[in-house]
Amino acid sequence: MRTYPIHHVDAFTSKPFEGNSTVVVFDAETLSETEMAKIAQEMNLSETVFVLPPSYSGQSADFRLRFLTRSGDEVRFCAHASVGALFALAKAQKFGMTKPGQYQFQVQTNAGTFAMHIDAANPEVPLISYDLPTIDLTVAPYDHRELANSLGIEVDFLDRSKPVMIERTNNHLYFVTPSLKELGRLVVDQKKAKELAIRDKLVIFCALTPHAFDSQNQVHSRSFCPLIGIDEDPFTGSMQGGVAAYLFKHQMVDTTLGMIGSEQGHFLGRPGQVLIEIKKGPQFACKLHARAVQLYSAKLSLP
């Protein structure tokens, strides 16, 4: 009988049953492709993450992460599952993390190898940090009314003083709503939205507002993902760089800030938040700082 340690982690939160959930599977190198897919289907979460040795030499990587959806399909990268995996590894004292301190790892994914940092000064509540990919915001090729029609919403849900924009690195679309009230009332027609998503290869529709439930935060957002079969994601780490870039580009926050708080998930009953560190330079860049909480650990047994 083969056994695999598994850990259920809620990422982008420090409270159980909030943020975005993932299951982390350790020692996955002896699992077949079919077994990984079946495990992900059984866990029935948006993504399950598998920890393996790096698949190649020549480029330095400490370990590899693979991400499979509830349908058993593999995706190149998943932010909340990455946070969950690093949190679980820190809690289990893997890869030399046996003492309080600072640790950095080169993490191989199908989207590339990334430097990820774990602040384990307090091992009970490690802080996970990593640089977000290059951000390339451009004005979208349609106006507010066209977007509203394509999403099946009233145009008044959009702040028409702010442009609709697309972040080309990840193919995420961003638009602004006037207030938290309008953001909370937003109901996207998933069928219509999927048609636009397929046509323009848009992975995420991000609705944001420069208002927040927590006074320490500067922005609240919602994430609609019909292209990948997710009506709404509780918390989407990959779109946070675009959120920060949009806010700074249009001076919707104090542009002297070195860190902004971003929240998501409250309208789904799974509130979460991250800190986005703004890295000063000729090109906008930022770094994500996230917490997580582990719900349980178990052993998965397979013949």
Model-derived features: positions:
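Active-site proximal loop and beta-alpha junction motif in alpha/beta enzyme cores
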Residues: 1-77, 83-303
